[in-house]
UniProtKB/Swiss-Prot annotation:
Keywords: Ribonucleoprotein, Ribosomal protein, RNA-binding, rRNA-binding. The keyword rRNA-binding applies. It comes from the Bacteria. This is one of the proteins that binds to the 5S RNA in the ribosome where it forms part of the central protuberance. Part of the 50S ribosomal subunit; part of the 5S rRNA/L5/L18/L25 subcomplex. Contacts the 5S rRNA. Binds to the 5S rRNA independently of L5 and L18. One of its GO terms (cellular component) is cytosolic large ribosomal subunit. InterPro entries: Rbsml_bL25/Gln-tRNA_synth_N (IPR020056), Ribosomal_bL25/Gln-tRNA_synth (IPR011035), Ribosomal_bL25_b-dom (IPR020057), Ribosomal_bL25_C (IPR037121), Ribosomal_bL25_long (IPR001021), Ribosomal_L25_dom (IPR029751), Ribosomal_uL5_bac-type (IPR020930). Residues 207-216 have a biased composition (Basic and acidic residues). One of its GO terms (biological process) is translation. Residues 193-216 are annotated as: Disordered. This is Large ribosomal subunit protein bL25. Pfam families: Ribosomal_L25p, Ribosomal_TL5_C.
């Protein structure tokens, strides 16, 4: 997994709109860090650094966060995850960001992006890839989190799906969707007929019954 680093400063003024606006004019974005074993810590981050980071990470990316005080001393260092981002409704700029610092050895809930790779057999026959879930909600230990899950769908034929039960998740990670939930399917467009194979078992009873009628 790629290593992502971010530096921040402690923020003493909390909840005052004027102070927050002053921060933003200085090119800083307010934020907070919290977790099960730490006190919430108000921080500010250089806007350019945060925007660059947001282009590189997902919700499942581990970020090494270092927070310093006014004198430049490091007062907090922890691996964190992005928990929530507030955007301005008019400008779509980041207004505030929440980071979650997980407790070591304890599980957390997170959404992991899914990346479907390979050209399915069904697509070569005219089928269409329909992605049902772009992310997988999981309960997981922080130590086994991955930035994305790659799923090979090259063997999927017309009308076939890749289900949660087909995933091979690392030990310590559990999907929070039913096992029979499809993640992606190869849809059959109108006008394309799928050949149905008839098994010997299905044909045999008809032959036997025909023999009985002839005996009668």
């Amino acid at each position: 997994m790629a290593q992502h680093k971010l530096e921040a400063l402690t923020r003493n003024v909390v909840g005052k709109k004027r102070a927050v606006r002053r921060l933003r004019k200085q090119g800083l974005i307010p934020g907070v860090v919290y977790g099960p074993d730490i006190e919430p810590l108000s921080i500010s981050i250089k806007k350019s650094n945060l925007i660059k980071l947001l282009y590189e990470v997902t919700e499942a990316s581990i970020i090494s966060l270092s927070v310093k005080d006014e004198t430049g001393n490091e007062v907090f260092s922890h691996d964190v995850f992005i928990k929530n981002i507030q955007y301005d409704k008019l400008t779509d700029e980041v207004k505030h960001i929440d980071f979650y610092a997980p407790e070591k050895g304890h599980t957390m809930n997170i959404n992991i992006p899914l990346e479907f790779i390979g050209k399915p057999k069904g697509v070569e026959k005219g089928g269409i890839v329909e992605i049902i879930h772009h992310e997988l909600p999981v309960e997981t230990l922080p130590s086994v989190i991955v930035e994305k899950l790659e799923i090979d769908i090259s063997n999927l034929d017309l009308g076939e799906s890749f289900h949660v039960s087909d995933l091979k998740l690392p030990t310590g990670m559990t999907a929070e969707l039913p096992e029979n939930e499809p993640l992606v399917t190869i849809a059959i467009p109108r006008g394309i007929e799928v050949e149905e194979t008839t098994s010997e078992e299905e044909v045999e009873p008809e032959v036997i019954e025909k023999g009985k009628k002839e005996e009668e």
